[in-house]
Amino acid sequence: MQQIYKIIFLSFNQDFFYKTIKILINIILIVIFILLSSCNFLTDKKAFFLNKEFSQKEKEFKRLKEKKEYLKKHTIHKHIFSYGNTISIFLKKSGVKINDILKLIKIDKNLNNITIGQKIVCKVDNLGNLIKLKWYISKFQKKIYKRYKNTFKFIKYTYDSFLEKKSIYIKKNSNFFKSAYQSGLNKSEINSVIKAIEWQINFNKLHIGSKFNVIFLNQKTKNKKILLGVKLDNLDRKYFSIRAFNGKFYDSDGFNKSEELINFSFLKKYRISSPFNLRRVNPVTHRISRHLGIDLAMPQGTPVIATSSGKIIKAQFNKIAGFYISLKNKNYYTTRYMHLKKILVKVGQKIKKGEKIALSGNTGRTTGPHLHYEIWINHRAINPIKAEYILSTQLTKSERIKYLKESKNILSKLK
């Protein structure tokens, strides 16, 4: 019996042992599974945050790249200056920030002196930042301004090509044209020399042995030469004619004594009954309308004098202007004469300044006898009272100082 109990006890202990071992193994497996699951969760969580951080950095990088690309985009604005334009007005219309305009002008105040016919080209980004500006002072001079951080730097003031000097000697049994041709000048170059200095000398009275020194800008890319200066030695007298920034020629002291383009003395003889006004109340219609000229009170039949030389392009009747004349000058401007009694010229006829072209009257839409007079420059009406300054060949005091400074280079090469 005791033996039987022993066997049963051993069997029970063996089953208990195995069950215990099995339970422990299961517990260990469960713990391992939990630990592994926890590691995977942490890894996944870490990966999630890493991916999120990378995604944010990628988005930020993409945003900065797009911003950079956006800033790279720019607009080019070009403009040829006419009466009434300023650098500030042009840059504002081009979308340039006010601060940039002020900084640019502070660097070079001469930008406020841009004259009619000069060209400006500017590059502006999408945020209104001025990137670059070119000022074409003349056919042979330009200034370049470039953005540098938050300000601007003056880059260059240059001749585009190279200078070419030639000498012309007046020989016996010859004249200027023949001598210049023998010196290698073509017809166009010879004519440019004549126009540059004819207001100082008489080409028919040049003496044998007289010598011309001329300097041209040789534009390689355009296969063209531009006259910059002329010097003449004639009977121990020296004459100079240097091209200025406005394209006109002046002597070594900055003066040009050539004849004025428009004879304003005729206009000054009569009272202005109605001035130039872009918002005038019309005395006939009683509506606000542009008055693009001046009215000169004068009796009917008063001789109307051509204030400039040129060609008649219109001589006809209009129900508002009455009998009127348009006279075009080769130097880019036109003068108009309205409400005439009688026209004394024909279309196509060439007229000299001071020549009688009509009789004043009271035709068209008027309230009384007068002459309506207009001046147009580059297809734009200007105030005739201010035109005397605009069309003047003379330099202002500040322009003359600028000319004397800039002409030194050409003068030194002519001597």
Swiss-Prot record:
Its cofactor is Zn(2+). It holds the Pfam family Csd3_N2. GO terms for biological process: proteolysis. Its EC number is 3.4.24.-. Zn(2+) binds at H291. The chain crosses the membrane at residues 23-43. Residues 77-122 form the LysM domain. GO terms for molecular function: metal ion binding; metalloendopeptidase activity. InterPro entries: Cell_wall_metabolism_enzyme, Csd3_N2, Dup_hybrid_motif, LysM_dom, Peptidase_M23. One of its GO terms (cellular component) is plasma membrane. It is found in: Cell membrane. It is a single-pass membrane protein. Keywords: Cell membrane, Hydrolase, Membrane, Metal-binding, Metalloprotease, Protease, Transmembrane, Transmembrane helix, Zinc. Belongs to the peptidase M23B family. This is Uncharacterized metalloprotease BUsg_310. It comes from Buchnera aphidicola subsp. Schizaphis graminum (strain Sg).
